[in-house]
Curated annotation (Swiss-Prot):
Propeptide stretches in the record: 25-40
GO cellular component terms attached to this protein's record: extracellular region
Domain of life, source organism: Eukaryota
Record's function text: Has antimicrobial activity against Gram-positive bacteria S.aureus ATCC 2592 (MIC=10.0 uM), S.aureus ATCC 43300 (MIC=10.0 uM) and B.subtilis (MIC=30.0 uM), against Gram-negative bacteria E.coli ML-35P (MIC=10.0 uM), P.aeruginosa PA01 (MIC=2.5 uM) and P.aeruginosa ATCC 27853 (MIC=2.5 uM) and against fungus C.albicans ATCC 2002 (MIC=10.0 uM).
Source organism: Limnonectes kuhlii
Name of the featured protein: Rugosin-LK2
Expression across tissues: Expressed by the skin glands.
Subcellular location: Secreted
Similarity section: Belongs to the frog skin active peptide (FSAP) family. Brevinin subfamily.
Lineage: Eukaryota, Metazoa, Chordata, Craniata, Vertebrata
Length: 75
């Protein structure tokens, strides 16, 4: 009876260890997915910034051309 309890306790111990390893791997996989979304968000923000800067530059050059035209009275 005592040896049977020992073996059952040993099997329970091994099962608990393997379960904790599985949970650790699962949480590591979930963390990787979160990092991908953060990287994607960062890349979208960077693209948005470059588009906004390009639009501001083109609008600024348009305004400057109009001002130069009105100052020179060549319009």
């Amino acid at each position: 009876m005592f040896t049977m309890k020992k073996s059952l306790l040993f099997l329970f111990f091994l099962g608990t260890i393997s379960l904790s390893f599985c949970e650790g791997e699962r949480s590591a996989d979930e963390d990787d997915e979160g990092e991908m979304t953060e990287e994607e968000k960062r890349s979208i923000r960077d693209k948005g910034k470059t588009i906004a800067i390009d639009l501001a530059k083109s609008a600024g050059t348009g305004v400057l051309k109009t001002l130069m035209c009105k100052l020179d009275k060549s319009c």
